[in-house]
Design a protein with these regions (language model features):
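ATP-binding N-lobe of GHMP and related small-molecule kinases
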Residues: 1-94, 113, 117-122, 149, ...
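Residue-level signal for inorganic ion chemistry
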Residues: 13, 41-43, 66, 100, ...
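Hydrophobic C-terminal alpha-helix "anchor/cap" residues
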Residues: 32-35, 128, 222, 254
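Conserved, helical-rich catalytic subdomain that frames metal- and/or nucleotide-binding sites
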Residues: 51, 138-140, 144-227, 240-279
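Glycine/serine-rich anion-binding loops at beta->alpha junctions
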Residues: 86-115, 133, 227-241
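Contiguous, small/hydrophobic- and glycine-enriched helical/loop subdomains that border
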Residues: 108-145
Length: 279
């Protein structure tokens, strides 16, 4: 069977670290939205018990989250079926948009369906968490308030907007950010309702803009159109619009400056889950 879908990206409308856990990970509080834009992924199921990644990423296949996700499913279920996976990457790597995590979640969701594994959502969320902290939101597939390391998700209805998402010419290494003395890692915990009553922020932004001034330049540029934010640990930044025409006008200005960007709309349901529901 041949199946193609869009592996979407996410934005963090706010992001705070509330403390370090005994296992070395950090607890966070963040509000995710899913966008209708992402990498095109194609799956062709086979009967030869092999997982083949047809797209060359320039590093060993065994290190790829797409491959790891497929092999994790096989190991968990003892599935003897195979698949050929190809991907058309459009999302920037290291942008804080969750592209790689979304790809891994897409593999779990799609192969669970195509291989007739019938794993429930709770199991898929657990598998996703083992692959990465951003994977569960893409298994969830809706806007959600996240706590823990990002795996404790509460679905939230968020008004949908068009977002202009721009990425400067730099990649931000997340691990280095966590080691920074300037990163606030003890923000007092709040409920979602308390967060929504205050101005939003991203705890990584002050650290990133100091190390990467081009991110600050981009945030300042986007401020002409509304409140601008950085997503995740950066470096992609975004601003919300109520209509696509205003977003397109702003994007033209970015194009003149040769700044990479795209326009996408937040959605109530991930395109992956929407496509799978049609099968």
């Amino acid at each position: 069977m041949l199946f193609t879908t869009t592996s979407p990206c996410k934005l963090n409308l706010f992001l705070y670290i509330t403390g370090k856990r005994p296992d070395g990970y950090h607890n966070l509080e963040t509000l995710f939205v899913i966008l209708d834009y992402g990498d095109k992924m194609t799956f062709e199921t086979t009967d030869d018990d092999k997982v083949e990644l047809l797209t060359d990423f320039g590093f060993p296949v065994a290190d790829n989250l797409i491959y790891k996700a497929a092999m994790l499913l096989k190991k968990t279920t003892n599935c003897q079926k195979g698949v050929k996976i190809s991907i058309d990457k459009v999302l920037p790597q290291g942008g804080g948009l969750g592209g790689g995590s979304g790809n891994a979640a897409t593999v779990l969701l799609v192969l669970n369906k195509l291989w007739n594994l019938n794993l429930d959502k709770a199991t898929l969320l657990k598998l996703g968490t083992s692959l990465g902290a951003d994977v569960p939101i893409f298994i969830q597939g809706t806007s959600a308030y996240a706590t823990g390391i990002g795996e404790i998700l509460t679905e939230v209805k968020v008004p949908n907007h068009y977002y202009l998402v721009a990425t400067p010419d730099c990649k931000v290494p997340t691990k280095l950010l966590f080691s920074s003395d300037k990163l606030v890692k003890n923000t007092p915990s709040k409920t979602l309702e308390e967060h929504l009553k205050t101005s939003h922020d991203n705890c990584f932004t002050p650290v990133v803009v100091q190390e990467y001034p081009q991110v600050q330049t981009l945030l300042d540029l986007l401020k002409k159109y509304g409140k601008s934010y950085m997503s995740g640990s950066g470096s992609s930044c975004f601003v919300a619009f109520d209509d696509i025409d205003h977003a397109k006008c702003a994007q033209k200005e970015l194009n003149k400056l040769k700044i990479s960007s795209f326009i996408a709309k937040s959605v109530d349901l991930s395109p992956v889950i929407a496509d799978l529901n049609k099968l």
